[in-house]
């Protein structure tokens, strides 16, 4: 099995880029070449690092310092070699609420993330939440992308930002409690607002994806799974608050449209609340795989979720799974490798090499 790619990516930090992409593309097709893909980084690892540099007048000013963030990432990858399917990717990041902000929403900036301000108090005002290419967040992401494309040559690839549109965007602007109550009191207005929060998503996605493609950059974002064509990771976090019936009424129609935007689709399924809708996810043919985020505390260890993982495998979908190093052997004994894409948190190069050898034996 061998895939032909439209262009080559030459990086001194990732000399085996094409070999790794062969494994990724086999995974998209629910196949295995020699071993399962493995990324040596945990989900949300970037949000555990606080930047103590203090040269800005506000948190927003720090987040908007495009050259600083690209330079910082460049320095972090120089001299390193990325093993497995760990790809050096800089993706422009203005926080998880950047898409609502592109529509005219507002956010509070913190050290490692942002929080949406719930600014919609009356649906009569929802018309003001519209995308504009003159929006400061969109323009800053564009600037950050251009700087990264120039500075990253030979060191890293460039991705696109985290995009939460549709229901999650409406949730950010309206507020979770209010939106959920509105589903009972004003269901048609909720549907109309969700539709409005989805309308410009293809335009924004295609703008950045086209820019990456023109610069021979794979399509990739925060989850670090690239595609030579187009990749998107839908998220449906609001679904954790909804019944199966509400999900099908308010979220599923939007999701079925969202997955049409890209060739390769991996659904972000965050926690058991969202997982109650798994049967609906598995019926969507465009979804290649599901990223399962089991959570912490009582939701650990991963072995309690083996039946859920096997259900996804049985449906012919891939599964992206976060593992601790200590869980690897038991996990390998419990499930088939077919469809598995591992994320393992370890910075130890020798440990990474040992894991890669171990995975070659997983049949």
Predicted regions and their residues:
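Residues forming anionic-ligand binding surfaces in small-molecule and nucleic-acid pockets
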Residues: 118-126
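Short acidic, low-complexity segments enriched in Ser/Thr/Gly/Pro
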Residues: 113-117
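Short, compact, well-ordered microdomains
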Residues: 96-99
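Active-site loop segments of alpha/beta catalytic cores
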Residues: 1-45, 50-59, 70, 76, ...
């Amino acid at each position: 099995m061998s895939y032909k790619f439209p262009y080559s990516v030459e990086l001194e930090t990732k000399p085996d880029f094409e070999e790794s992409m062969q494994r990724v593309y086999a995974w998209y097709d629910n196949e295995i070449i020699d071993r399962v893909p493995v990324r040596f980084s945990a989900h949300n690892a970037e949000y555990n690092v606080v930047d103590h540099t203090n040269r800005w007048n506000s948190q927003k000013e720090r987040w908007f310092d495009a050259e600083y963030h690209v330079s910082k990432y460049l320095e972090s990858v120089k001299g390193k070699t990325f093993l497995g399917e760990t790809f050096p990717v800089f993706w422009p990041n203005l926080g998880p609420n950047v898409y609502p902000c592109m529509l005219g929403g507002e956010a509070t900036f913190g050290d490692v993330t942002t929080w949406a301000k719930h600014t919609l108090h009356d649906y009569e005002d929802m018309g003001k939440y519209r995308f504009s290419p003159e929006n400061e967040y969109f323009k800053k992401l564009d600037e950050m992308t251009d700087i990264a494309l120039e500075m990253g040559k030979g060191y890293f690839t460039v991705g696109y930002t985290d995009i939460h549109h549709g229901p999650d965007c409406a949730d950010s602007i309206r507020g979770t409690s209010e939106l959920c109550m509105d589903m009972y009191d004003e269901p048609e207005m909720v549907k109309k607002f969700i539709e409005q929060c989805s309308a410009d998503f293809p335009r924004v996605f295609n703008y950045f994806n086209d820019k990456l493609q023109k610069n021979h950059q794979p399509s990739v974002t925060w989850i670090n799974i690239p595609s030579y064509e187009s990749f998107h990771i839908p998220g449906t976090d609001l679904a954790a608050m909804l019944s199966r019936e509400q999900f099908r009424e308010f979220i599923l129609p939007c999701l079925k449209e969202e997955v049409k935007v890209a060739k390769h689709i991996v659904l972000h399924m965050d926690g058991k609340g969202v997982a109650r809708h798994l049967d609906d996810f598995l019926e969507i043919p465009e979804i290649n795989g599901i990223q399962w985020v089991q959570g912490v505390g009582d939701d650990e260890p991963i072995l309690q979720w083996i039946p859920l993982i096997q259900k996804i495998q049985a449906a012919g979908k891939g599964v992206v799974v976060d593992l601790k190093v200590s869980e690897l052997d038991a996990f390998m004994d419990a499930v088939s490798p077919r469809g598995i894409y591992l994320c393992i948190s370890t910075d130890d190069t020798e440990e990474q090499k040992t894991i890669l050898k171990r995975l070659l034996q997983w049949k």
